Regions:
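Proteins that catalyze or organize thiol-disulfide redox chemistry
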Residues: 1-130
Length: 130
């Protein structure tokens, strides 16, 4: 189920809800391009304060210590986009992937492969990335 915001964002994406263990950076297309150019594996996740599925994932699988440890060991960077107010940069990223709303999770492997993850995340699914 995709959710759509009701008010436009006045500013660019900011990080507000990333689980502390993942050390997420704010999503920008430029930062994603930099990480991909350096062949760094990246998990991009788009969230919103009003998205219940997002919050379940953030308090569950994304907050799990095993996920944080696996990402650290594998050098996986995390970029979080906050779509709470309908940020147009995030809207464009979502639309480019045929998505109408959040949650949205995409893993970019070091070899360039892109994998869209399910809307409900699991610890096993996340620790298997990379």
């Amino acid at each position: 189920m995709a959710l759509i915001p009701t008010a436009p964002a006045p500013v660019a994406a900011t990080t507000t809800s990333a689980p502390a263990g993942l050390m997420a950076q704010p999503f920008t297309p430029a930062r994603l391009a930099e990480l991909r150019a350096s062949r760094t594996p990246v998990l991009v996740y788009m969230t919103a304060d009003w998205c219940l599925t997002c919050k379940v994932n953030e308090r569950g699988a994304l907050a799990d210590a095993a996920v944080a440890a696996a990402f650290k060991a594998k050098g996986i960077a995390v970029l979080e986009g906050d779509w709470t107010r309908g940020d147009p940069v995030i809207s464009q990223w979502l639309q480019a992937r045929g998505r109408a709303g959040v949650p949205a999770y995409v893993f970019y492997a070091a070899d360039g492969r892109e994998t869209e993850l399910p809307q409900i995340l699991t610890v096993g699914g996340l620790t298997a990335l990379g």
